[in-house]
């Protein structure tokens, strides 16, 4: 499991896509739906972009995994969730939710989950998130905007 975190407009979605092998099957859950993300599906035939309401996301995610073959015939290599903040926006429940995602990844043992977290200036990832075993954290930095005066 890989967790990509950073402030908005810092290239988290782009980083998530750079981790994906375009020759392998991928589910991309676009919860913060962006027009640019939908265009990615047209460029890459192995990328299926889906938008879900936040009500019962874990059940919907498991249904999609089973729909792609479940334990035995599963051809998924990656599951990207962009951004998790739309599912769990409170800091207390986020580690528990991430550990449930890790359990799903371990249970099916066929794909890697890439989770994107939008960290605001008041929402820092602390030691509570480091307790999940086998998780790689990648931080993106916000680029400074250049102002050109003509």
Residues of each region from the PLM?
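Conserved P-loop NTPase "ATPase switch" module shared by AAA+ and STAND
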Residues: 72-93, 112
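Short acidic, S/G/P-rich loop/turn micro-motifs used as interaction or catalytic elements
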Residues: 9-11, 34-35, 55-57, 84-92, ...
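Conserved beta-strand segments of the P-loop GTPase G domain that flank and frequently precede/overlap
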Residues: 5, 29-30, 50-52, 82, ...
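Phosphate-binding/switch region of NTP-binding enzymes
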Residues: 117-150
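Conserved P-loop
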Residues: 1-64
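Conserved alpha-helical scaffold flanking the Walker A/P-loop in AAA+ ATPase domains
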Residues: 61-74
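Substrate-engagement module of ASCE P-loop NTPases
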Residues: 91-122
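P-loop/Walker A phosphate-binding loop and immediately adjacent motor/lid segment at beta-alpha junctions
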Residues: 43-47, 71-72, 143-150
């Amino acid at each position: 499991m890989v967790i990509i975190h950073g402030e908005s407009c810092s290239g988290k979605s782009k980083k998530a896509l750079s981790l994906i092998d375009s020759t392998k099957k991928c589910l991309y859950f676009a919860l913060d739906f962006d027009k640019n993300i939908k265009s990615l599906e047209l460029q890459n035939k192995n990328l299926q972009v889906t938008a879900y309401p936040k009500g019962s996301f874990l059940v919907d995610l498991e249904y999609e995994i089973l729909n792609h073959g479940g334990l035995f015939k599963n051809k998924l290599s990656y599951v990207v969730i962009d951004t998790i903040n739309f599912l769990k926006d409170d800091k207390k429940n986020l580690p528990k939710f991430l550990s449930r995602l890790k359990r799903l990844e371990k249970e099916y043992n066929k794909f890697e989950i890439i989770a994107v977290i939008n960290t605001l200036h008041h929402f820092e990832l602390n030691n509570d998130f480091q307790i999940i075993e086998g998780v790689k954290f990648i931080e993106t930095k916000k680029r400074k905007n250049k102002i050109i005066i003509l």
